[in-house]
Amino acid sequence: MNRKTVFWFTNAVGPLILVSYWRGVQAFDDPSVYWGEVPTSMQSLIVPWMFVAAAGYLLMFHRFFFAWSEDEVASLHWPWSPEDGKGVQRLMLLYAAFLLCSLVWIDLTRMYIEGPSTVGMVAIVAVLWTAGAASVGFAVLVWPARERLNGAKVAIAGSVMLSIQCTWWDALYWVMNFGF
């Protein structure tokens, strides 16, 4: 697998996520139903953070696909394992987990709102936790290269920005406050 494959995957699935969100918001007369029991005061804090998270995503994206070479991305490895040239595969795994879970979240939530069930709740929590874990995973993957690759700390900062949204606000706070 090469980096171009990951690049095109992200560019194919990313717009589908935006379409799924647009479609999800259009599904209800009052789209605020997606907030569940999250207090309005917290919504006004979470929504701006979504833009911070998007900026963090773009910081990482720039490093992975424009700033670093194919070989530099291939050199990325987990902190607990040696470099083996499979950084692109690891990156694909993280992007697939993050993007595919992001793609199905709003539809799962819509189905849950229309007909609450334990299976629906578990599915929503699972995709949010998976997306949250993947958002942290980007920083974990880049961490061993933080002194070696130019701009690695920028990618780590981007992952942290994204992770605050996906792990804290979505997978933890929203899940605890939605009203399952």
Language model features with spans:
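Membrane-proximal helix-loop-helix units in multi-pass membrane proteins
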Residues: 69-134
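Alpha-helical transmembrane segments and their helix-start/interface "positive-inside/aromatic belt" motifs
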Residues: 1-14, 44, 86-91, 148-160
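Terminal transmembrane helical module of multi-pass membrane proteins
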Residues: 133-180
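Membrane-interface interhelical loops and short amphipathic "cap" helices
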Residues: 27-43, 109-121, 174-180
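Alpha-helical transmembrane segments of polytopic membrane proteins
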Residues: 7-10, 42-53, 120-134, 156-162
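Membrane-water interface of transmembrane alpha-helices
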Residues: 55-72
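Alpha-helical transmembrane segments of multi-pass membrane proteins
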Residues: 14-28
